[in-house]
Amino acid sequence: MKAIVVKPPKPGVEVRDLSQVIRHGSGTVKVRILENGICGSDREIVKGELTTARPPEGRDWLVLGHEALGIVEDSSDPRFKPGDLVMPINRRSYHGKCLNCLVGRPDFCEANEFVEAGMVGMDGFMVEYWYDDPKYLVKVPKDIADIAIVAQPLSDLEKSVEEILNVQRRFIWTCDDGTYNCRRSIVFGTGSTGILISLLLRTVGFEVYVANRRDPLESEAKITEEAGIIYYNYSKDGLDKLKSMGFDLVVDTTGASASLIGHEVEMLKPNGILGLFGFPSEGELTLRYDVIQRFIYKSNAIVGLINGQKPHFQQALAHLAQWKVVWPTVAKSLITRVVDVNNDKELLQVLNHKERGEIKVKIKWS
């Protein structure tokens, strides 16, 4: 059985023939892999840069991959039948000791005892087939099979938007018509995370800006134009203009210098919120006393955003179906490359390097 294997924390990746069966939880549903998605976390593991990555207990290797689309081959659970398309949930409860884990929300595990498929203590899904627990499988409509792999990263952002809206229920944040149409947001970063959360915010009803340090790529221009998103090059037009405009919501997806966050704080309107998705890779964050005073006086908030769960996968699939209808160009642009798992050269290339303009790269198994 072919699998893509890593040995964290060591760098490197290999295609290996496994003799053992990969089984998760009750393992009552047999799933054959159709395709995997690749994201930055996979590449960090391959390069030995993700310090939290670790194999399952008792061995030194780990099957990579937390984004997957598969087809059910056999099931003893009546909710799933052969031929069903499914996606597995990547973050799962380990001991199930805290209340959040007990009610299916290990994304809020208070004991910090969870596993993450293909990353932390649990084999991933870059493998020909595996046996899984139906609790952690989501059915996928066949009509969106071509873009369904995007549902995993999108699920994290579904939860992010939900969390932002929940925090903002501390006061009345909707407009006088009951919508969010009067609320202005800006997303820093135009990678896959930035593009996807921008699309979600437009779907919810926000006015949306996206910001980067360069002019938009052709693919970004097409997406932002169709979705009604405003692109802003802050290396050309500056950050001070954004501070003077003011935003109800600022989202950082850059994973760049922590110093940018200090500027983003100053862009918040009264009652505004800053969402941080991803981890700064360098720099320091220093806030002057007067900036902190204004932050307090304006009742601003900052929230960390990470990992969706099963309800968010379902929401993501519904939104992908919606986007195929209302934004067909956007939907077609979400998959930027497809690589055959048997093409070793291309496979190693996409597992090690992100391409310019990449949103989602798929590994095709069959």
Swiss-Prot record:
Give the record's keywords alphabetically: Carbohydrate metabolism, Metal-binding, NAD, NADP, Nucleotide-binding, Oxidoreductase, Zinc
Q: Which domain of life is it from?
A: Archaea
> What are the GO BP annotations of this UniProt entry?
non-phosphorylated glucose catabolic process; protein tetramerization
Question: Which cysteines are cross-linked by disulfides?
Answer: none
GO molecular function per UniProt? D-glucose binding; glucose 1-dehydrogenase (NAD+) activity; glucose 1-dehydrogenase (NADP+) activity; NAD+ binding; NADP+ binding; zinc ion binding
Quote the record's binding site residues for NADP(+): N212, R213, R214, F277, G278, F279, L305, I306, N307, K354
Q: Which cofactor does it need?
A: Zn(2+)
Pfam families named in the record: ADH_N, Glu_dehyd_C
**Residues that, per the record, bind substrate:** S41, N90, E116, Q152, D156, N307
Q: Where are the transmembrane segments?
A: none
Enzyme Commission numbers on file: 1.1.1.47
Reaction(s) catalysed by this chain, per the record, are: D-glucose + NAD(+) = D-glucono-1,5-lactone + NADH + H(+); D-glucose + NADP(+) = D-glucono-1,5-lactone + NADPH + H(+)
Q: Where does Zn(2+) bind?
A: C39, H66, E67, Q152
Q: What does this protein do?
A: Catalyzes the NAD(P)(+)-dependent oxidation of D-glucose to D-gluconate via gluconolactone. Can utilize both NAD(+) and NADP(+) as electron acceptor. Is involved in the degradation of glucose through a non-phosphorylative variant of the Entner-Doudoroff pathway.
* Record-linked HAMAP family: Glucose_DH
Matches recorded under PANTHER family: L-THREONINE 3-DEHYDROGENASE (PTHR43401:SF2)
Protein family membership: Belongs to the zinc-containing alcohol dehydrogenase family. Glucose 1-dehydrogenase subfamily.
Report what the protein is called.
Answer: Glucose 1-dehydrogenase 2
Q: Which organism is it from?
A: Caldivirga maquilingensis (strain ATCC 700844 / DSM 13496 / JCM 10307 / IC-167)
